[in-house]
């Protein structure tokens, strides 16, 4: 075990063993928190803050579809921070462009319009609708230099931006330490088993997108590459297969200031969570102590889809929301894939509002997440490319 991870474990054990944070005057601080909560509730800001923590999928591919109309209303009311596209939402490139234009037109705050466009097997926009596809990460790393990959990824980012997307939920920086991994290695979703090579290609991906005003998200923290199971379908425990070298791409990219968002994985890693049954996405030790305190990540932490079976088969909806936020997630994704629920934003708001009214620590978490998300959106606004390039047809 490296000295670096050993230091993390020592710090985490110390912090997690404290029953309450040390304060100079806990009574006075409690009064201040209660006053802040009262003001937030009175002026309606609590609901608005929670809205910036919820990113949802929707059913429909035209402005006339009920699912689209619903998210437009939620965006207008400030109940969501953004949307995520799946294949079901894409009928044509022009239709997507108009959907995104409508969403931003009515939103009270700029929306994150997200998509998984990694390349290879994982891309929602395909050649079938005239979108120029890109190779998988594995193929890119085998056939191109990082400089050549940068050109490919700049074209990708430009195409996404022209359609109204401002967040690509990629790159995958998991190490390909298990080529038989059903959700990473077998699908060609990893650049390499070499941390330095992964970092080089991921940096090319990130910088290319940033140049075109598109945010990116490193995934899947703290590492999904060694798993033997798919967390979409249930528990994926990497405790015995994971090693701390899987943190290196995250650590080095964060240290260089190149990371906007980190996506939390639903894998179980007892080496980091100090529990045999807590997924990384619900683990304070993993997301707050390791990622925030030890690795000094200052950006936005976003969950993987909270409706994946690794979560839904093992934790109630209410508990998953509460635990995810307290663990350190700033945004929760609900892709609404297999069992769409248009009421998700309202349900999340009810759960978090009630908890915040009785738990000052939850209020602090909501406020911190809101600040993180709004800082991200301000950065997006200052970086958005003014290009009007039409997406190149296949």
Show which residues each predicted segment covers:
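Alpha-helical scaffold segments that flank or form the walls of functional sites
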Residues: 144-165, 246, 323-324
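Preference for extracellular/luminal or secreted protein segments
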Residues: 2-5, 13-73, 284, 293-294, ...
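Acidic/histidine-rich, surface-exposed loop or edge segments in extracytoplasmic proteins
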Residues: 50-58, 78-85, 185-187
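Second-shell residues forming the walls of enzyme active-site clefts
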Residues: 67, 83, 92-105, 111, ...
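N-terminal small/glycine-rich loop or linker at the start of catalytic domains
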Residues: 44-58, 118-137, 180-182, 217-235, ...
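Glycine-rich, aromatic-flanked loop segments that form ligand/cofactor-binding clefts
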Residues: 104-132, 152-176, 198-222
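Catalytic domains of carbohydrate-active enzymes, especially glycoside hydrolases
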Residues: 72-86, 162-167
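A charged helix-plus-loop insertion that forms the helical arch/lid used to bind
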Residues: 131-144, 188-192
């Amino acid at each position: 075990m490296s000295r670096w991870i050993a230091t993390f474990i020592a710090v985490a054990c110390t912090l997690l063993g404290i029953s309450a944070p040390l304060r100079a005057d806990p009574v006075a601080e409690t009064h201040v928190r209660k006053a802040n909560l009262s003001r937030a509730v009175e002026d309606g800001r609590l609901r608005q803050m929670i809205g910036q923590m919820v990113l949802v999928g929707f059913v429909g591919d035209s402005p006339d579809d009920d699912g689209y109309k619903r998210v437009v209303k939620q965006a207008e009311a400030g109940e969501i921070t953004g949307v995520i596209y799946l294949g079901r939402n894409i009928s044509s490139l022009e239709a997507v462009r108009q959907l995104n234009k409508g969403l931003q037109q009515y939103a009270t705050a700029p929306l994150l319009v997200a998509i998984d466009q990694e390349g290879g097997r994982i891309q929602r926009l395909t050649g079938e609708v005239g979108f120029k596809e890109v190779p998988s990460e594995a193929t890119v790393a085998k056939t191109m230099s990082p400089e050549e990959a940068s050109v490919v990824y700049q074209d990708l980012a430009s195409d996404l931006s022209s359609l109204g997307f401002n967040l690509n939920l990629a790159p995958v920086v998991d190490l390909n330490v298990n080529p038989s991994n059903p959700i990473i290695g077998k699908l060609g979703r990893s650049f390499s088993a070499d941390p330095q090579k992964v970092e080089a290609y991921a940096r090319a991906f990130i910088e290319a997108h940033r140049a075109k005003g598109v945010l990116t998200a490193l995934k899947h923290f703290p590492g999904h590459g060694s798993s033997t199971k798919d967390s979409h379908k249930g528990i994926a425990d990497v405790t015995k297969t994971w090693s701390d070298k899987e943190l290196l791409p995250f650590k080095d990219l964060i240290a260089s200031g190149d990371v906007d968002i980190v996506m939390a994985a639903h894998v179980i890693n007892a080496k980091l969570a100090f529990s045999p049954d807590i997924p990384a996405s619900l683990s304070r030790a993993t997301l707050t102590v390791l990622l925030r305190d030890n690795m000094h990540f200052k950006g936005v932490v976003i969950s993987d889809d909270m409706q994946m079976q690794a979560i839904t088969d093992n934790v109630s909806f209410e508990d998953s929301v509460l635990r995810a936020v307290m663990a350190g997630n700033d945004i929760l994704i609900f892709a609404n894939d297999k069992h769409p629920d248009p009421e998700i934003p309202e349900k999340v708001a009810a759960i978090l509002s009630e908890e915040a009214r009785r738990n000052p620590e939850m209020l602090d978490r909501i406020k911190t997440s809101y600040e993180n998300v709004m800082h991200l959106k301000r950065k997006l606004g200052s970086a958005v490319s003014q290009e009007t390039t039409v997406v190149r047809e296949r």
